[in-house]
């Protein structure tokens, strides 16, 4: 036996969401973003399912790409933050990893580091996010340097990133899209701008390649829509079980600080999951979990290893019953809203002690 706190990853949901993406972006190449351990869903679980069904995996760094290769997955990988030192270039080219170039230092490393094979590159341009990327007026010089470098593959791509795509009404979105579309420098063989939110809201931004992240895992990129609204299915189910049940007298205080009590006798269930597992500590009152086909409210403070739920009106629920913290029935978007954060953060903050099943 082991602690019941676990993640259940649904391959069929992942494939459904990929199908939805391809329906929204017909004929477009797909880079599946699997950085940060596939948004917490587990790259070991996700990458083999998607292998051969997409054009590339998007990762943040060399280490993440090597972890995918170690799984025996053959789909190409793209390092979205590029290399962090010139030494990484030889490892990247030996493993056929493509690199994003987003600043002059990376370009200099590439030009001054002879490589045994041509390396595939994408150039990132800053169209308004002001985080990574060359300025538009620098692109001509960048392209010139790449075209004359004999160890650069000439299938060079151009990409940018939208700062406000999750807020489709913001004028900055169309401004960035227009700036990107107006770039007419020859030599760029493929272009990419659309993340999850843009795939849905800005079909004209899909260009040659789309880059789904959060929607691939069945979570909405928008604050006012959830997965079901978008025809997506949650890939991650964060599960645990009830480890204890106590019958308490009226006005018994529950948990740290005694922040919750009832003016009548109560029945309190203890669930083996807490903020040490990645469940948010700061949630609003009556945030639900799913037990035996219904929602049950969390009461009291979430502690490191446990949380407590009110079973007063649910006498049939027993020790050992499964609890869905978020997933198919209680969408992670609801928990994120309750915690004052976003689904991205909750998926990515699952701790190492939570096992995958």
Curated annotation (Swiss-Prot):
The active site is at 35 (proton acceptor), 256 (proton acceptor). Pathway: Amino-acid biosynthesis; D-alanine biosynthesis; D-alanine from L-alanine: step 1/1. GO terms for cellular component: cytosol. It is an enzyme of class 5 (isomerase). GO terms for molecular function: alanine racemase activity; pyridoxal phosphate binding. CDD domains: PLPDE_III_AR_proteobact. Its cofactor is pyridoxal 5'-phosphate. It catalyses: L-alanine = D-alanine. Substrate binds at residues 131, 304. The keyword Isomerase applies. Transmembrane segments: none annotated. It holds the Pfam family Ala_racemase_C. Its EC number is 5.1.1.1. Keywords: Isomerase, Pyridoxal phosphate. The modification N6-(pyridoxal phosphate)lysine is found at residue 35. InterPro entries: Ala_racemase (IPR000821), Ala_racemase/Decarboxylase_C (IPR009006), Ala_racemase_C (IPR011079), Ala_racemase_N (IPR001608), PLP-binding_barrel (IPR029066). Catalyzes the interconversion of L-alanine and D-alanine. May also act on other amino acids. Belongs to the alanine racemase family. HAMAP family: Ala_racemase (MF_01201). PANTHER family: ALANINE RACEMASE, ALANINE RACEMASE, CATABOLIC-RELATED. This is Alanine racemase. It comes from Legionella pneumophila subsp. pneumophila (strain Philadelphia 1 / ATCC 33152 / DSM 7513).
């Amino acid at each position: 036996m082991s602690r019941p706190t676990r993640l259940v990853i649904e391959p069929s949901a992942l494939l459904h969401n990929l199908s939805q993406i391809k329906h929204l972006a017909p004929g477009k190449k797909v880079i599946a973003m699997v950085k940060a351990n596939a948004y917490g869903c587990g790259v070991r679980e996700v990458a083999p399912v998607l292998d051969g069904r997409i054009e590339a995996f998007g990762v943040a760094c060399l280490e993440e790409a090597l972890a995918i290769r170690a799984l025996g997955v053959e789909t190409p990988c793209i390092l979205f933050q590029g290399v962090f030192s010139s030494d990484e270039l030889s490892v990247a080219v030996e493993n056929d990893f493509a690199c994003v170039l987003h600043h002059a230092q990376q370009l200099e490393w590439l030009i001054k580091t002879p490589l045994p094979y041509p390396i595939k590159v994408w150039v990132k341009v800053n169209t308004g996010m002001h985080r990574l990327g060359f300025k538009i007026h620098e692109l001509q010089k960048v392209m010139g340097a790449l075209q004359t470098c004999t160890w650069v593959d000439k299938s060079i791509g151009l990409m940018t990133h939208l700062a406000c795509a999750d807020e489709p009404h913001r004028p900055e979105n169309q401004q960035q899209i227009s700036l990107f579309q107006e770039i007419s420098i020859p030599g760029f063989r493929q272009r990419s701008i659309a993340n999850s939110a843009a795939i849905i809201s800005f079909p004209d931004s899909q260009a040659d390649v789309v880059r789904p992240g959060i929607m691939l895992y069945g979570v909405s990129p928008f604050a006012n829509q959830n997965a079901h609204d978008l025809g997506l299915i949650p890939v991650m189910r964060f599960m645990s079980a009830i480890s204890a049940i106590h019958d308490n007298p009226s006005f018994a205080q529950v948990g740290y600080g005694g922040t919750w009590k009832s003016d009548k006798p109560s029945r309190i269930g203890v669930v083996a999951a807490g903020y040490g597992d990645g469940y948010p500590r700061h949630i609003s009152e009556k945030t639900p979990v799913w037990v035996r086909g219904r929602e049950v409210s969390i009461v009291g403070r979430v502690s490191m290893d446990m949380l407590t739920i009110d079973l007063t009106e649910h006498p049939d629920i027993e020790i050992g019953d499964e609890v869905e913290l978020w997933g198919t029935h209680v969408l992670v978007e609801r928990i994120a809203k309750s915690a004052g954060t976003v689904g991205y953060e909750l998926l990515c903050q699952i701790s190492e002690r939570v096992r995958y099943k």
